[in-house]
Amino acid sequence: DVCSSDLIMEATTLSEARVYVGTYAKYNNGSLYGAWLDLSDYSDKEEFYEACRELHEDEEDAEYMFQDWENVPEGLIGESWISENFFALRDAVEDLNDTEQEAFFVWCNYKSHDLSEEDADDLIKAFQDEYIGQYDDEEDFATQIVAECYELPDFAETYFDYQRFARDLFMCDYWFDDGFVFRAA
């Protein structure tokens, strides 16, 4: 119900994040030996690095090389580092469904949020304040607003210009990106 802002959202792929962990020494000696580690198995960065140490216990002071990764957003990992904020963000989005998580990253990108620096809980709260839902296009959203918020007689619905109403809504009050509608803040 758009009028009362009681919107239902959907789950997360951060829970499926994984990293292939090798070392620079092995790589420089022609070996790609390593293993895929599921980040959901670790509560924080320190636990993850402990698993890396165990995996490469044959090396003293191993320099870990993250040779590949899946479901880790840009800016939270590189070849030789992983952001502490990944684990906080993963935990913060735990209650979001897949659709909401996708919308969250669209929102973060549109707003140019730095996922490696900003507080994960604050990001989720701000996202939830602005997220409306998933729609085919701006006119689809405008049609729903009219249906839920205005009691137009049946004959008037056929004359209502949903396209212009959508244009007006998205001029200042809302924005649309990649199938998602957000409140302009």
Predicted segments with their positions:
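Short, small-residue-biased leader/transition segments that mark boundaries at the very start
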Residues: D1-S4
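N-terminal ordered "arm"
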Residues: I8-D58
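Acidic, proline/glycine-rich low-complexity IDRs
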Residues: M9, T13-S15, E139-A185
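Non-transmembrane, interaction-prone alpha-helical and coil segments associated with secretion
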Residues: T12, A17, E70-W81, D95-E102, ...
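Ordered hydrophobic segments in well-structured contexts
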Residues: E16-G22, G34-D38, E63-Q67, D173-A184
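Conserved aromatic
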Residues: L39-Y42, Y135, Y159
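Structured domain cores in non-transmembrane regions
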Residues: S43-D114
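Extracytoplasmic/secretory-pathway segments with low complexity and glycosylation-like composition
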Residues: F104-C149, F182-A185
